[in-house]
Structure formats: C-alpha cells, structure tokens
C-alpha cells in the first residue's frame, strides 16, 4: 500500500508540473528560453562587432595594416580574450544557481571575487602582449608585420581590462534573467564605437593605434553603463555587506570551477586557430587560407547567434537547479535543444541554398568562390552540429559540468580532430576539406559526449548538488537572507532616478 501511495503521489506531482507548464517540452518554457535568447543575440552581436569594425577600418588604411591587425586580433583572442571568457564561464554556474536558491548576497560575492581574480590575471596577459613581436618571430612572420601587430596589441591592453570587468558584469545580469541593461549598454557601446573609431583612425590619423584604442573606450563605456544599472539594482543592497572572508571563500569556489571552464571553452576555440595555421602550410596557401578564413568567419557569426540560446539555457537550467526544481530544469534543457534544432535547420538550409553565391560576400575571386562552394556541404554539417553543441555547452555551464566539458574538448579536438584533419589534409591530399572534416568529427564527438551526459543525468540529484554548492559556507555569509526581490524593478528604479534627475 505504501508503494502504491508513493506512485500516486509521484503521478500527482507530474500532473501538477504539466499543468504549470513544466512538462519535458513545454510551450511556456520555450517562451522563457526564447524571450531571453532574442535580446542576448543583440548583445552578443554588438560585442562581437567591436573588433570586426576596428579591423575593417584598419584594413582600409593599407594591406600591411590589415595583415597586422588580423594577426594581432587572432593572437590576442587566443592568449587573452578567450581565457577571460573561459574563466568567466564559471559564473554561469555559480551566479545562476545562487539566484535560483535565493542566496542573493552570494551573487555579488561571486561577481566581485571573479573581477579581482581576472584583473590579477590580466597583468600576466599584458606582459605577453608587450612581447608579441618576439612571439610572432617564432612563427617566422614578416618582421614589419610583427612590429605593427605588437604595437596594436599593446594599445589593446586597456580593452583587455575593460573586457575583463565586462564579462562578470554580463553574467551578473544574465544569471538573473535581466537582459534590458545588457541590450542597452552593448548597443550604446556599438553606436559609440563606429563614429569614434572612424574619428581616431582617419580624422585624427592615429591609424591602427586608433583602431585599438576605440575598442578599449567602447568596452569601458559598456562597463560604465552596466555599473549604473548595477548601482541602482535591487540586488545592490545585498552586495553592500560583503566582507573579506566572504570574498575569499567565493574566490576559492570561483577558481575551482574557472579552470575547467577555461579548459572547456579555450581548447575548442584554439583548435580553430590551429586549423587556420595548418592551412597556411599547404602548397597554394593563399587560396586555402582564404577559404578556411571564410568558413571560420561564417561559423563564428553563426556561433554568436546560436550561443544566445546556450546562454539562455544556461541561465534557466542553473536557476531551476538552484531552486531545486529538477523537472523545470529538464524542461529548460529540452526546450533549448528544440530551439537550437530549429535554428540549425534554418541556417543550414539557407546556407546550402546559396552555396554558389555566398562566397562573393567575402571575395570577388572566382577561384575562391568556387572552392568555398565545394566546401559548403561540410560547413553546413559543421554548423548543424555546432548549433546543438552551443546549446548543450550552455546546459553544461548551467549544471556545473565544466570538468566533463574540458576533458571532452581535450579528447575530441586534440586527440582525434586535429590529428585526423592533418592526416586527411596532407596524407590523403584533401587539403582544406580534410582539415574541416577533422574539426567536424571532433565537434560531433564532443556533441555525443554532452548528449549522453545530458540524457542519462539524474536531474533530481543535480538539483541537490546545486543547492549543496550554493549553501556551502553559507553560515559565514552575511546578507544571504531569502529576501523577496522582484528583478523587474531593477530597470524601473534606474528609469525613475533618471526622470527625477531630468
């Protein structure tokens, strides 16, 4: 009789969850995920375009400037920006689950402690950038290009520090599901960046130095705008009582999760840069590198778009796990996967339909366009796989699976993908196609790993782990009372303050 009663209770709970829109695939959850993903697309694109616009304006100076800025952008992404993004990925877990558990003081502790850690790390990155020309000489780059690239990298250091503060602040709002401040600040920074970059590069004759400085000013403007929103947010009251002990304990939790998070993100990011370097070793390196660059750019633009769904999935999964709602967390996962699949179909069908003409967006050379057309089917498969991979990576960050993701990235890309790509490219004579097939297989392996982990996960157990993580060392933390906070009032408080000022 006891077993029967338990079964009845379980069925009643599932029926109630279904009525509340918490079935394994619910329209309500899809609306939540998509409503957050839409503005995050604008945020991601706005931040992505800052470096692209500076590169385009520098490219119109002369061919030498374009080469130097392109190489510097690639190396600074590998040695700096990618690491910051990777470390900040730990906050997707920590801040999101803390908000779900209503431990609001911990959100501020995690945010501030991560800022301190990342700022200290930035100084070591800056030293590397000061000697960028020496690093480029190791790869036998042209001395003049190396000097210009080093000069651009040095003047990009202020942008690195601004970007370092921007990432935790973005996670601070994202973990609460507040997207309006992110949308306004990133769009405002982009609108400022375009004329300001033009002014520095062309009118004031700063050249590539102006292109680098404009990125720094734009990042710091974004940080300033987000700080204003944060200063007048409801959660700011919970952050005023933070002490040294709380910051140290939060710092330990952050570092423990930040290292595997950086491993998970950076190893995948770096593999594409290695792909580009390998294409330069081919006989017709100019053609091969051009086509691989076109594919990488197309894939990067698509990833910026689909990663917004992953960010939304990360937020909803972490919030629900922190709140102990394991069924809602699973519903968020399934809804995000469904939306990612829809986006994958639309993108791949569109790209394949225009496979004979999309290359003209990047080049007027018929040989380049013809080669791009040949590699498009492989690129479409890669984009299809990466659409689901971006979503499941977001689920992994929200669930705290960064360590699994790090090992998956290491094994799939560096033990399988890159060696296989080299074999297909140079031994089987498939050239650039072979390189891209290797990366495609690596992405597929990583996707399978994430899919298996997600499918066989006990979400009720994950919810328990999340709450254990959040409430770790909670007795020492002041200001973690379960205060009822309505996140929608954050923006309203700021607007009221502005209205009173005016």
Curated annotation (Swiss-Prot):
Keywords: Membrane, Transmembrane, Transmembrane helix, Transport. One of its GO terms (biological process) is xenobiotic detoxification by transmembrane export across the plasma membrane. It is found in: Membrane. Pfam families: MatE. InterPro entries: MATE_euk, MATE_fam. The keyword Transport applies. It comes from the Eukaryota. The chain crosses the membrane at residues 36-56, 68-88, 112-132, 143-163, 182-202, 208-228, 262-282, 291-311, 331-351, 375-395, 408-428, 436-456. One of its GO terms (molecular function) is antiporter activity. Disulfide bonds: none annotated. It is a multi-pass membrane protein. Its main location: membrane. GO terms for cellular component: membrane. PANTHER family: MULTIDRUG RESISTANCE PROTEIN (PTHR11206). Belongs to the multi antimicrobial extrusion (MATE) (TC 2.A.66.1) family. This is Protein DETOXIFICATION 7. It comes from Arabidopsis thaliana (Mouse-ear cress).
């Amino acid at each position: 009789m006891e077993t029967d009663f338990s079964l009845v209770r379980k069925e009643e709970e599932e029926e109630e969850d279904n009525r509340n829109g918490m079935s394994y695939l619910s329209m309500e959850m899809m609306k939540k995920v998509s409503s957050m993903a839409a503005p995050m697309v604008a945020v991601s694109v706005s931040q992505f375009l800052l470096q692209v616009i500076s590169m385009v304006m520098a490219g119109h100076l002369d061919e030498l400037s374009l080469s130097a800025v392109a190489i510097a952008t690639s190396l600074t992404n590998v040695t700096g920006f990618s690491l910051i993004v990777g470390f900040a990925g730990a906050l997707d877990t920590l801040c999101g689950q803390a908000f779900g558990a209503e431990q609001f003081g911990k959100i501020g502790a995690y945010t501030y402690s991560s800022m301190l850690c990342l700022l200290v790390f930035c100084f070591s990155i800056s030293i590397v950038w000061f000697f960028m020309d020496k690093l480029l000489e190791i790869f036998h780059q042209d001395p003049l290009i190396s000097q210009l690239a080093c000069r651009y990298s040095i003047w990009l250091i202020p942008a690195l520090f601004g970007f370092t503060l921007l990432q935790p602040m973005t996670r601070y709002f994202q973990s609460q599901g507040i997207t309006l401040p992110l949308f306004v600040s990133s769009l405002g920074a982009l609108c400022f960046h375009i004329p300001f970059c033009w002014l520095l590069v062309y009118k004031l004759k700063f050249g590539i130095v102006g292109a680098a400085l404009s990125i720094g000013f734009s990042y710091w403007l974004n940080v300033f705008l987000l700080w204003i929103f944060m200063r007048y947010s409801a959660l700011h009251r919970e952050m005023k009582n933070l002490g040294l002990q709380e910051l140290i304990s939060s710092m330990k939790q952050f570092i423990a999760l930040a290292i595997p998070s950086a491993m998970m993100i950076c190893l995948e990011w770096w593999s594409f840069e290695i792909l580009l370097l390998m294409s330069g070793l081919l006989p017709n390196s100019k053609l091969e590198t051009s086509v691989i660059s076109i594919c990488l750019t197309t894939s990067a633009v698509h990833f910026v778009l689909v990663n917004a769904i992953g960010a939304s999935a990360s937020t909803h999964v972490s919030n629900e796990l922190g709140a102990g709602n394991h069924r809602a967390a699973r519903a968020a996962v399934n809804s995000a996967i469904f939306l990612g699949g829809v986006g994958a179909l639309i993108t791949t069908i569109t790209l394949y339909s225009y496979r004979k003409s999309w290359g003209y967006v990047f080049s007027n050379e018929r040989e380049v366009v013809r080669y791009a057309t040949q590699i498009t089917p492989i690129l479409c498969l890669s984009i299809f796989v990466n659409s689901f991979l971006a979503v499941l990576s977001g689920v992994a960050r929200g669930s705290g699976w960064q360590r699994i993701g790090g090992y998956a990235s290491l094994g799939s890309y560096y033990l399988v993908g890159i060696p296989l790509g080299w074999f297909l490219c140079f031994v089987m004579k498939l050239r650039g196609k072979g390189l891209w097939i290797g990366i495609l297989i690596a992405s597929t392996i990583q996707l399978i790993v994430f899919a298996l982990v997600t499918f066989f996960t006990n979400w009720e157990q994950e919810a328990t782990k999340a709450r254990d993580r959040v409430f770790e060392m909670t007795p020492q933390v002041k200001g973690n009372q379960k205060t009822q906070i309505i996140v929608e009032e954050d923006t309203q408080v700021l607007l009221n303050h502005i209205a009173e000022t005016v």
